């Protein structure tokens, strides 16, 4: 086995199979495992996906939320063992791959047009 095959085998073991389809503009709820002392708990983090970077086991999403009037962004490794769950709450209709322009917007200007799926 050469080096590339070994790396591919290691990455294949770390990739989670039960993830939902996540797109830029989705409103998601990420369950993050937090360790406080010797206790562990799941902390939910809700927000809009403003960026997604695909790179096999190193895929990341950037989630932005408003907390007490201040924008907070956090980058999550999708396949990290610290991520317990990712739930897509709603979808939005966007025309950009990265929604960095939301950083300058304030209040109602940060709203995105909601996308409804046909049943």
UniProtKB/Swiss-Prot annotation:
Q: Which domain of life is it from?
A: Eukaryota
Q: Where in the cell is it found?
A: Plastid, Chloroplast
MF terms (GO), sorted A to Z: structural constituent of ribosome
Residue stretches spanning the membrane: none
Pfam families associated with the record? Ribosomal_L19 (PF01245)
Looking up InterPro entries in the UniProt record yields: Ribosomal_bL19 (IPR001857), Ribosomal_bL19_CS (IPR018257), Ribosomal_bL19_sf (IPR038657), Translation_prot_SH3-like_sf (IPR008991)
Q: Which GO terms describe its cellular component?
A: chloroplast; ribonucleoprotein complex; ribosome
Q: What keywords are assigned to this protein?
A: Chloroplast, Plastid, Ribonucleoprotein, Ribosomal protein
**Leader sequence segment:** none
* Single GO biological process annotation from the record: translation
Q: Note the PANTHER family from the entry.
A: LARGE RIBOSOMAL SUBUNIT PROTEIN BL19M, RIBOSOMAL PROTEIN L19
HAMAP family membership: Ribosomal_bL19
**Family classification:** Belongs to the bacterial ribosomal protein bL19 family.
Q: NCBIfam families from the xrefs?
A: rplS_bact
Q: State what protein this is by name.
A: Large ribosomal subunit protein bL19c
